[in-house]
Regions:
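Glycine-rich beta-alpha loop elements in corrinoid/cobalamin-binding modules
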Residues: 2-118
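Membrane-targeting and insertion segments and their boundary/processing signals
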Residues: 38-46, 127, 151, 183, ...
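Radical SAM [4Fe-4S] cluster-binding motif and immediate context
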Residues: 132-218
Length: 218
């Protein structure tokens, strides 16, 4: 029912068209029929969606843990009630972090920057808000032995897209990381884990965490 595509960097844009073509999905969103999947984009490049907006039904702005299940519940409800594709997109458009390109008329300046975005559907918002997870202790990788220690970065380097996209910096508590690490080692069969973030060395309790892991993994 859905095709979800993570837009990690602009060089993958041609792969999007190839993916849709090989899947026998109509390339342009406006031409898709009722029986075709909803094509949804997310990830860093979704913050500048217009170059590929014609190929997507929905862009998810922000972190998937916040509204993804809500979106799926709306889809199930619409399908159960015999609703149309457009009716589901209208329901999705009311979620603050969902951008439905078909519901906006976009005009451009001569240099191809956006001049104006005007909603053309009453369910579309005047603006789309990025959603983030506020309580980072509630976020975890359910399957991989990968511990995300923090999201965001304190460095704020001007050249770094990820540093801007994943603002603000949010750390997991030391006790939560200890629990995740020991649980993953006991339940996955893996003998090692990875600490993941944009800049793990900046985690404020890194020494205590490393000392704990050294003892735990002996």
């Amino acid at each position: 029912d859905f095709i979800g595509i993570t837009l990690q960097y602009e060089m993958c844009y041609t792969n999007i068209l190839q993916l849709l073509d090989l899947s026998q999905v109509t390339l342009l969103s406006k031409d898709r029929g009722e029986d075709e999947p909803i094509v949804m984009g997310g990830g860093p490049c979704s913050y500048n969606p217009e170059p590929v907006a014609d190929f997507f039904d929905i862009f998810y702005m922000g972190e998937g843990e916040t509204e993804f299940y809500h979106l799926l519940d709306l889809y199930k409800e619409n399908k159960k009630n015999g609703g149309t594709r457009k009716e589901f997109l209208e329901m999705a458009a009311e979620i603050p972090c969902m951008y439905v390109p078909a519901f906006y008329d976009v005009t451009y300046n001569e240099d191809c920057t956006i001049k104006e975005m005007v909603p053309n559907n009453p369910h579309a918002k005047g603006g789309v808000r990025k959603d983030i997870v506020l309580d980072f202790d509630k976020v975890e990788y359910p399957e991989k032995p990968l511990v995300e220690v923090q999201r965001g970065c304190i460095r704020e380097c001007r050249f770094c897209q990820a540093g801007s996209v994943y603002k603000p910096l949010r750390e997991k508590s030391l006790e939560k990381l200890k629990y995740l690490a020991t649980t993953m080692l006991k339940t996955t069969g893996q003998e090692e884990i990875s600490l993941s973030s944009l800049s793990t060395s900046d985690y404020s309790h890194l020494k205590e965490l490393i000392d704990f892991l050294i003892e735990e993994c002996k």
